[in-house]
Amino acid sequence: MASVQAYAQWVTVHLINSMSSETLSIQNASLSWGKWYKDGDKDAEITSEDVQQKTAPPGGSVNVNSCGRSDASSGTTGGFDLYDGNTKIGRVHWDCPWGSKTNDFDVGERNKNYWVEIGTWNKYGGAIGTVDVEVGRKR
């Protein structure tokens, strides 16, 4: 059975692709703390390479999940780059530390030719939760 403490620190990035013909892809997925996991199962760890295989088709979506490790007093800190083909859209980054009162979530290094909308997320204590990150191309 996994540690409730570590698994209480989690984030699900729900990527929503609002582009009409381009597919969103993920590159440079990395974690300083925690682990990646399959949708709905914190015990089913996946690799950064598995995360980088995920895509969101035009008009579709995909989830990227991370949490703290069981039996460790650590949360999750990490991120990944969002791409449209060879064009970087921005870098999704979060910090959901164990034992801290504040969380952080942002999409930085944004490309001016795209819009990115970040949904609500839990800033204070516990899990960041599920965060919608919707991406589109400016006209």
Swiss-Prot record:
Pfam families reported in the protein's UniProt record: Aegerolysin
Residue span(s) of the pro-peptide: 1-5
UniProt KW keywords: Cytolysis, Hemolysis
One term of GO molecular function: low-density lipoprotein particle binding
Biased segments, Polar residues type: 62-75
GO BP annotations, alphabetical order: symbiont-mediated hemolysis of host erythrocyte
InterPro entries in the record: Aegerolysin-typ
Signal peptide interval: none
Region (Disordered): 47-79
Source domain of life: Eukaryota
Protein family according to the UniProt entry: Belongs to the aegerolysin family.
Protein name, as recorded: Asp-hemolysin
